Amino acid sequence: HLVQNKDQPIRLIDIREKEELVTGYIEGAVFAPNSIVKIRPEEFLPEKDTPLVLYCTSGRRSLATAKMLKGMGYIDVVSMAGGFNAWIEAGYRFKTDGTMDQEQIKRYSRQILMHEIKEEGQQKLLKARVLIVGAGGLGCPTGLYLASAGVGTIGIVDFDRVGLSNIHRQVLHATADIGRPKTDSAKNAILRINPEVNIVTFEQRFTPDNALDIIKDFDVVIEGSDNFETKFLLNDAAFLSGKPYIFGGAVRFDGQASVFYPKGGGPCLRC
């Protein structure tokens, strides 16, 4: 926990709270949560003449705490500019205690810090298998955000090809994709965003003959089609399979979104 400089040892202090350490930490740093340091600094920092470098996530909290400690008689205390985020961006080494690798920690660090997600939630996302029926105006942004969030496997069902009139709203497709199957275009775009995602494509119509077989390996099904026949068909397949069904619809400036999960005690789309 001592960093050497040409004059004397420097003590590196990580003032983040415990739940923030899931994103990693600098090896050798002393963990001293800011919530305690502000009240009882001597518990972690008994010697006021030892040079201290404090860091938090962005550098803002550590800067304020450094000023506070100086006012309490600590002689040489500074804040690491940019905090742990800057350390990571600079490519310096850090350690993690979880099961995610450093690349995953960097990619998902902003959402892992959220209390509603944390590392446990991110692990669930990485293992999740989500099917999207329709790679159009609804399915494209859905696929984009699911991939960015780290959903491990995304299935895409669509039999159509990219047309010029699609591009203004179907954000996974580009002018160069005109004439290509939407499943191929969507897959390539998603992999550019997050190459870790496993993409399973079904270049076919979603019909009563294949519906149950297509959705069988997925945890959640998302409806992004443009017709009621497919919406009700996916609802029925999800009902029979006991899977959550996420419904979506949009016309002009109006939109609807709902989650149907009869197995969990709720209604289905036909109720």
Predicted regions located by residue number:
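Adenine nucleotide-associated cytosolic modules
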Residues: 34, 39, 48, 71, ...
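Short glycine-/small-residue-rich Rossmann-like dinucleotide-binding loops
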Residues: 16-17, 226
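Short beta-strand/turn micro-motifs composed of small residues
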Residues: 14-16, 56, 134, 158
